[in-house]
Amino acid sequence: MIIRDENYFTDKYELTRTHSEVLEAVKVVKPGKTLDLGCGNGRNSLYLAANGYDVDAWDKNAMSIANVERIKSIENLDNLHTRVVDLNNLTFDRQYDFILSTVVLMFLEAKTIPGLIANMQRCTKPGGYNLIVAAMDTADYPCTVGFPFAFKEGELRRYYEGWERVKYNEDVGELHRTDANGNRIKLRFATMLARKK
């Protein structure tokens, strides 16, 4: 049962809309202990918390976390817990039912990715889920925007061998950034919802 829809926090607080893949994931992933890695201004964390998920929301930007805390207080979301952390230097041990990272990994140092994904996998309870959406660098859509990291073709899928992939694709999507002509930049995005066996 959805208590707050995807437009609630957008309309009331002018946040970016909840990511479409999070909206799809909640059709499968039941409320439980959740970790949002790179939560930004809370577009996903606030939606999840308002709909019964117990959310840890982490981001390196203290101003973003302060904004999440402000909205959390107004909305009385006691099941939302924030922390300022640099994902490039992060290790964690708590067990989660759902760990998500949407359009965040491409902003991290490439050397961080294998360890961070391993940490996500280790800290996911059996039967729990990981959701990742991140930019790719492919021959047909090369990543020219200067991200420190972008997945190669099939790379994210290989990280999750042995997991049940509920959804996986490497479809073309658009960044919010635009090119010199004002057109949104197109890239492939690795999109995956996987369940730990």
UniProtKB/Swiss-Prot annotation:
Annotated binding of substrate, by residue: R177
Start and end residues of each stretch annotated as S-adenosyl-L-methionine: 86-87
Catalytic activity: tellurite + S-adenosyl-L-methionine = methanetellurite + S-adenosyl-L-homocysteine
The protein's enzyme class: transferase
Pfam families noted in UniProt: TehB (PF03848)
Effect of H176A: 95% of wild-type methyltransferase activity on tellurite
Binding residue positions for S-adenosyl-L-methionine: G38, R43, D59, T102
E.C. no: 2.1.1.265
Mutation effect (R177A): 35% of wild-type methyltransferase activity on tellurite
Domain of life per record: Bacteria
Keyword line: Antibiotic resistance, Cytoplasm, Detoxification, Methyltransferase, S-adenosyl-L-methionine, Tellurium resistance, Transferase
Outcome following mutation: D97N: Decrease in tellurite resistance
Subunit structure of this chain's protein: Homodimer.
Biological role: S-adenosyl-L-methionine dependent methyltransferase that catalyzes the methylation of tellurite and is responsible for tellurite resistance when present in high copy number. Can also methylate selenite and selenium dioxide. Is thus able to detoxify different chalcogens. Cannot methylate arsenic compounds.
Protein family per UniProt: Belongs to the TehB family.
Protein name per the record: Tellurite methyltransferase
High-level lineage: Bacteria, Pseudomonadati, Pseudomonadota, Gammaproteobacteria, Enterobacterales
Name of the gene encoding the protein in the UniProt record: tehB
